[in-house]
């Protein structure tokens, strides 16, 4: 939108092409420019990773690990996606609503005002979810068409661990309404506050992403209030198993599930010295971690993830 210029530093960080100067964003104008920028970024990404892999080899990183392997090795080239849901919702907002650009005194876009409603990823709405499928396929194709070190097989992931917090710190406002320099939603999770139709609709959206296009992982983290799963312990276990079975039956592969109340997290954050929290472990996008070992900013990000309540009709 800004023609490759960073709105915070005012530096030319990407390819120098004509910025969008209109008051409202037009989907047919934004999409080709986004694809152009994404293709440039994919090329830069692969080039940097090629250098990293070469340096690993130079200092015997891989040789030491694989010295005893006497078979042909299938080499993969891992890449990853962050801010996935925000791109989907941003393109959806531009396509289905009206997005007004807020500019600074130099004319650079620094914020956006969304007028009207638009379909959001995470609600089992094909209008938004199909943008996600297109985005994943397009990015992987851009990676695959480039030379990779040792002719390795290009793969990708939608899995951020806790880096979504760091990446968000350096990313300005987006057309989906996300404020500047705030955390991205983790992994393949819908954007914060986007889920309006309950847990099952959210899972259905993520399950539509073809796993064979993201063999390094499509991470989805859900924190569920125990009461949302039923009244008794047995009922909760049974309902959770059914939810997970339904998700994986659709071809999904990775689900991080936390079942506890928000109050427990808040108390652990304020009173980490309590004995009960010494080994209190939660699932974060891709791995398990002791909650009290996270930074306060990371803890707040975990707490910000929407607590899901199963709707009556589900």
Question: Can you annotate each of these PLM segments?
Answer:
Residues 1-116, 199-305:
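Structured mid-domain segments that build the active-site/substrate or prosthetic-cofactor binding neighborhood
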Residues 1-17, 150-209, 220-222:
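Catalytic nucleotidyl-transfer cores of nucleotide-processing enzymes
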């Amino acid at each position: 939108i800004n023609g490759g210029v960073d709105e915070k530093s005012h530096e030319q960080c990407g390819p120098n092409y004509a910025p969008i100067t209109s008051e409202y964003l037009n989907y047919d104008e934004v999409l080709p420019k986004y694809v152009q920028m994404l293709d440039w970024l994919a090329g830069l990404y692969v080039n940097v990773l090629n250098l990293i892999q070469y340096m690993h080899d130079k200092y015997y990183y891989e040789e030491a690990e694989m010295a005893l392997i006497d078979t042909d090795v299938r080499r993969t080239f891992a890449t990853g996606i962050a801010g996935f849901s925000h791109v989907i919702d941003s393109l959806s907002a531009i396509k289905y609503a009206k997005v007004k650009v807020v500019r600074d005194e130099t004319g650079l876009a620094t914020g956006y005002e969304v007028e009207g409603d638009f379909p959001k990823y995470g609600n089992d709405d094909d209008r938004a979810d199909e943008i996600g499928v297109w985005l994943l396929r397009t990015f992987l194709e851009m990676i695959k068409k480039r030379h990779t070190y040792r002719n390795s097989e290009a793969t990708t992931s939608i899995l951020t661990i806790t880096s979504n917090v760091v990446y968000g710190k350096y990313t300005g406002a987006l057309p989906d309404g996300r404020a500047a320099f705030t955390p991205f939603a983790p992994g393949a999770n819908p954007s914060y506050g986007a889920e309006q139709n309950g847990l099952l609709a959210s899972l259905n959206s993520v399950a539509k992403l073809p796993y064979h296009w993201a063999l390094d992982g499509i991470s989805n983290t859900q924190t569920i209030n125990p009461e949302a799963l039923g009244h008794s312990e047995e009922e909760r276990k049974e309902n959770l198993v059914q939810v997970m079975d339904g998700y994986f039956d659709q071809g999904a592969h990775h689900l991080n599930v936390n079942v506890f109340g928000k109050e427990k997290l808040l108390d652990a954050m304020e009173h980490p010295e309590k004995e009960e929290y010494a080994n209190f472990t939660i699932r974060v996008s891709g791995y398990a971690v002791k909650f009290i070992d996270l930074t306060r900013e990371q803890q707040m990000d975990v707490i910000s993830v929407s607590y899901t309540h199963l709707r009556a009709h589900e």
